[in-house]
């Protein structure tokens, strides 16, 4: 995602971590082109964590909520979705008249599926899995979160 953000703000210098999302990294440009050939009217909506070769094929690049909003506002009836498969439920619920195709063979992230409402409830109720950080780090994190919320307004 750092690479994508740096292309959107070219006047800024970014120091980008060399990490990646294992799910978005598996979106293969050749597979996307195969799906595009099978569904030529479909728009390809990609998450910015996909590789740049994949993003180059996209009609729209945006966050999960951006993809959901774009599909809802678009007049198009078919979409290829380049992000985690959990988004399909929301897309199909909001847009029953539209068709969505995955941009990867296995679109589900096993790590995201480990978090359930029951597990969150249990952690909050039982006060387990608490994370401790030193005050210096916590202060910086709070400022970053407050700024993020401010920008979202």
State each model region's role:
Residues 1-153:
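The feature marks the mature, well-folded catalytic cores of soluble enzymes
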């Amino acid at each position: 995602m750092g690479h994508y953000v740096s292309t959107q703000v070219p006047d800024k210098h970014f120091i980008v971590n060399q990490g990646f999302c294992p799910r978005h990294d598996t979106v293969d440009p050749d597979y996307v082109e195969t799906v595009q050939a099978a569904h030529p009217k479909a728009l390809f909506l990609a998450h910015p964590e996909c590789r740049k070769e994949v993003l180059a094929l996209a009609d729209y690049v945006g966050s999960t909520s951006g993809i959901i909003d774009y599909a809802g506002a678009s007049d198009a009836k078919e979409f290829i979705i380049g992000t985690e498969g959990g988004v399909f439920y929301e897309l199909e619920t909001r847009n029953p008249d539209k068709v969505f195709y995955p941009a990867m063979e296995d679109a589900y992230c096993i790590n995201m599926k480990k978090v359930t409402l029951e597990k969150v409830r249990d952690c909050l109720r039982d006060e387990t899995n608490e994370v401790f950080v030193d005050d210096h780090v916590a202060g910086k994190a709070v400022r970053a979160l407050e700024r993020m919320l401010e920008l979202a307004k």
